[in-house]
Amino acid sequence: MANTSSAKKATRKIARRTEVNKARRSRVRTFVRQVEEAIASGDATLAKEAFLAAQPELARAATKGVLHANTASRKVSRLAKRVKALSAPTA
């Protein structure tokens, strides 16, 4: 239990930041899920649109410290690879 006023304030700040970060993380997951659903449906144009919407969300989460920069980069890279494979002609 926090005893000093500064520790109590820090606890309040942490609670507020946690709520903001939860919302951001949820938003990122939603965008990534939309891309994965579009890929699963096999619609290349829908997948590309969803990917283009998800990319800045992942970058924003990395900038804000919700995701590690390398994690966001890895997710973007893997999604891009899957979207590209979907639109590529099958040989």
Swiss-Prot record:
Coiled-coil ranges from the UniProt annotation: none
Keywords: Ribonucleoprotein, Ribosomal protein, RNA-binding, rRNA-binding
One GO BP: translation
Gene Ontology molecular functions: small ribosomal subunit rRNA binding; structural constituent of ribosome
GO terms under cellular component: cytosol; small ribosomal subunit
Region listing for Disordered, in residue ranges: 1-23
The keyword Protein biosynthesis appears for this protein: no
PANTHER family noted in UniProt: 30S RIBOSOMAL PROTEIN S20 (PTHR33398), SMALL RIBOSOMAL SUBUNIT PROTEIN BS20C (PTHR33398:SF1)
Role this protein plays: Binds directly to 16S ribosomal RNA.
UniProt-listed HAMAP family: Ribosomal_bS20
Family per record: Belongs to the bacterial ribosomal protein bS20 family.
Identification of the protein by name: Small ribosomal subunit protein bS20
Native source organism of the sequence: Rhizobium rhizogenes (strain K84 / ATCC BAA-868) (Agrobacterium radiobacter)
